[in-house]
Amino acid sequence: MRTIDIENVNVAAFDTMPTPEEIHARLPISAKATKTVTHGRGLLRKILERKDHRLFVVVGPCSIHDPVAGLDYARRLKALADEVGDTLQIIMRVYFEKPRTTVGWKGYINDPFMDDSFRVDIGMEKARQFLLDVAELG
């Protein structure tokens, strides 16, 4: 009797995904980025607790697909935030996926090259690098 191999017959390859620890080790957060995040969280807490008179405004692109354009947006938003900081606390929304998309491109993490290569491993690293770059702006 001949055994028919039916397991993984349509799988071309297996790639190992990096763990969060591996990504953090390759792309550690700097002291400046840590300060940005910590300071921002503290400000939001004060605003929500009404210990700060400002309003906070969350703005940003629907989904990051071009990190160069996204970082340009972040720089411009930072300049605006500095300008209106006495009345508003502006926070950049950064989202990498297309949660309501059922066809087509699913997002930067799933397909960072927008070529259906689905290099999620690279997408996770590129997404973290983008967040670190934005946090470095202060």
Predicted regions located by residue number:
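Active-site-facing alpha/beta catalytic cores
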Residues: R2-I6, T87-G138
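N- or domain-start disorder-to-order transition segments that initiate the globular core
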Residues: V9-K51
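N-terminal beta-rich core of secreted/periplasmic extracellular enzymes
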Residues: A33-K46, K78-I91, E97, A127
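Residue-level signal for functionally critical sites in structured catalytic/ligand-binding pockets
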Residues: R45, E49, H65, R93, ...
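Alpha-helix C-cap/termination motif
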Residues: R50, E83-V84, L137
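Conserved, mostly hydrophobic/aromatic
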Residues: G60
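Glycine-rich anion/phosphate-binding loops
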Residues: H65-V84, S117-Q129
